[in-house]
Amino acid sequence: MIRDTVVSGIFYPLEYHDLIEMIEYCYLNPRGPKKLPSKLGRYEKPIGVISPHAGYVYSGPIAAHSYKEISKKVSGNITAVIIGPNHSGMGSVVSTMEGIWKTPLGNLEIDNEFSERLWKECDIIDLDETAHLKEHSIEVQLPFLKHLELLNIAKFKFVPISMSLQDYDTAVGVGYMVAKVAKELNRKIIIIASSDFSHYEPEEIASKKDAIIIKDILKMEEEEIFTDVVTNNVTMCGYGPIIAMIKAMKVLGAKESKLLSYSTSGDVTKDYSEVVGYGALIIE
């Protein structure tokens, strides 16, 4: 299947040059890393990042922090596993797919062998295009990846995993299988958990709730993340993908974590009465 874009022209620019300009703006923005991607990267080990998926004007500079780190730690042929929440509710509860996804910067191929192996070896994961047709959480990550490719930093294939079922057992099961297949296929891998943090709460409340989850992420404690999301009614959309990413990274030997940036939509709109939180973190 060749999947066309769904939110180009809405979440990010539709035209090639406008999108390049927007991505560079995200990197150079005061809320961003303030530097363009590194062209001197070298892949040494798997890395995992958390990247938000709102409109680029709101969350793009925060996402740029994660992709700046990726640019420093990749080279050659890379498989990017992108795990995102399923906002539409369409399709299977956890699914991957095969084929090609379009972006305004050019197409990105799915690592079909990886996707098929996940489907065949994991009872949790279906091979289902339907779940991906209208979903934006994975799509909005792809222009950042393609931009790195256009800079000759690395050559990417990717594996989309959409999750509408985000209970603890499902999330850790997905993470374990991602790590298992990466080892079996000897892939140079990065894992991107696509998630925003708290939604539509006053800044003070949202930032306090998000700080609790960020602390759990930095400790790489999957069970604490799940418990604190439920206990504190944290309205983050991708806690399951985050738990899956952390589980996979721990299986792959990760020992370190770092908060790269945190911000809210209020920093853009200047309306702090109802914000969405955005965080960029790295696990390696």
Swiss-Prot record:
Coiled coil: none
Pfam name, any one: Memo
Disulfide bonds: none
Matching HAMAP family: MEMO1
Family statement: Belongs to the MEMO1 family.
Name of protein: MEMO1 family protein Mevan_0697
Organism for this UniProt entry: Methanococcus vannielii (strain ATCC 35089 / DSM 1224 / JCM 13029 / OCM 148 / SB)
Source taxonomy: Archaea, Methanobacteriati, Methanobacteriota, Methanomada group, Methanococci
